[in-house]
Amino acid sequence: MSNRMWGGRFASGPAEIMEEINASIGFDKRLAPQDIRGSLAHVAMLGKTGILPQADVAAIEAGLKTVQAEIESGAFTFQRALEDIHMNVESRLTELVGPAAGRLHTARSRNDQVATDMRLWVRDTLDALDAQAADLQRALAALALAHSGTVMPGFTHLQSAQPVTFGHHLLAYVEMLGRDRGRFRDARARLNECPLGAAALAGTSFPIDRHATAAALGFDRPTANSLDSVADRDFALEALAAAAIAAVHLSRFAEEIVVWTSAQFGFVRLSDRYTTGSSIMPQKRNPDAAELVRAKAGRVIGALAGLLIVMKGLPLAYSKDMQEDKEGTFDALQTLSLCLAAMTGMVRDLEPVPEVLKAAAGAGYATATDLADWLVRELGLPFRDAHHVTGRLVGRASARGVGLEALSLAEMREEEPRITEAVYAVLGVENSVASRTSYGGTAPANVRAQAERWLAALGDTQ
């Protein structure tokens, strides 16, 4: 079918390449549920305000529901010649109900229509991402609770720094995901205004009720400026920014899983369900799910950068450039959804290896800070002096290839004569983590309390 919905001004149809570059139905057909929801709300408002007779309203509503059923069943045929989801739906509606279908577009433009569709889709997707992030938080918090006392090395510069607990490490990601969910909700709150009724850019002379349409679609209010209504894609940018930050968090954890599962670390085991083998090396168990989560963060970040570049030079109000908002937004948010699901599955199957974690926690002089703190607390040394004393003791131990706990009291007293036998109590990794009782610290009691608080707040459905 040729496109004649806007063809009155034109003597001939578009070139084939124009049709190809112009069409968006290949990707915006996923907006069908939102497009039909918007049309149903719009036609109901047109009827209530007396703009359309009820007979036309009833016919259009019935036709839209038939179109929806056809799309859901797979019986609907999408046509590239009709450009986009709006025209595909309207064309089929015309076949079903005749001339009444042409009245659906009264007091509406594709400009406000697509802006409404996109806001509805992004809103639905943010809600789903929020729920998925909560699922991952539950999985992490449950594992953190089970390993609140499992000692592991804490790193800076990927070098052993201080002992922490495995549960404490996991709760760091629970906190990150909490901020991610806050950004999803913030983005949702700001996008929850309805552009429908702004028409092409200037509003309409028909006596429409935009507040009624907004309420019917679950928006808080209609948008206040018709130009901004159709020119704005901040809602997509903000959703993509929130998604990009969340993807970075998942990527960081994925990187740690890749490192931790390596033979060189052996901190954790991934289940067979989230690993793959090698076509040539029979011993391999590759952490492909984690590697793909790490890689896919780039797609999400790229979508944000891409849409920023599209929007940066556009004058008000609508330009066809804005059609490029869809593919990147769809792909990025659905990619994040996939990554959240994969990470949740990996965490639920993740098996820490406590004996390996503990052994690694004691390596690299990880209790050196505990020794410095002991010198301050017990001997009254200024911290900078304690730092230097400890550094010299680490140098002695390193030269001998032993841990701090292997130094004799006599050796320690050569650096600080007042050191006593009591110092050895702080050199064990369990004592180190147990001493970190400050709010937010890694002491097992703290970790248990924080994990329990999170599980209670999230509703533990493990």
UniProtKB/Swiss-Prot annotation:
Coarsely, its chief localization is: cytoplasm
Note the InterPro entries from the entry: Arg_succ_lyase_C, Argininosuccinate_lyase, Fumarase/histidase_N, Fumarate_lyase_CS, Fumarate_lyase_fam, Fumarate_lyase_N, L-Aspartase-like
Keywords linked to the UniProt accession:
Amino-acid biosynthesis, Arginine biosynthesis, Cytoplasm, Lyase
Q: What is its EC number?
A: 4.3.2.1
Pfam families linked to this entry = ASL_C2, Lyase_1
Asked if Ubl conjugation is a keyword of the record, the answer is: no
For this chain, one GO molecular function annotation is: argininosuccinate lyase activity
Q: Taxonomically, which superkingdom? A: Bacteria
Q: In which pathway does it act?
A: Amino-acid biosynthesis; L-arginine biosynthesis; L-arginine from L-ornithine and carbamoyl phosphate: step 3/3
Q: Which SUPFAM superfamilies match?
A: L-aspartase-like
Catalytic activity entry: 2-(N(omega)-L-arginino)succinate = fumarate + L-arginine
Q: Where are the transmembrane segments?
A: none
Q: What GO CC terms are in its UniProt record?
A: cytosol
Q: What class of enzyme is it?
A: lyase
Could you state one GO biological process linked to this protein? Answer: arginine biosynthetic process via ornithine
Compartments where found: Cytoplasm
Q: Does the keyword Lyase apply?
A: yes
What family, per the record?
A: Belongs to the lyase 1 family. Argininosuccinate lyase subfamily.
Q: What is this protein called?
A: Argininosuccinate lyase
- What organism does the record attribute this protein to? Methylobacterium sp. (strain 4-46)
Its lineage reads: Bacteria, Pseudomonadati, Pseudomonadota, Alphaproteobacteria, Hyphomicrobiales
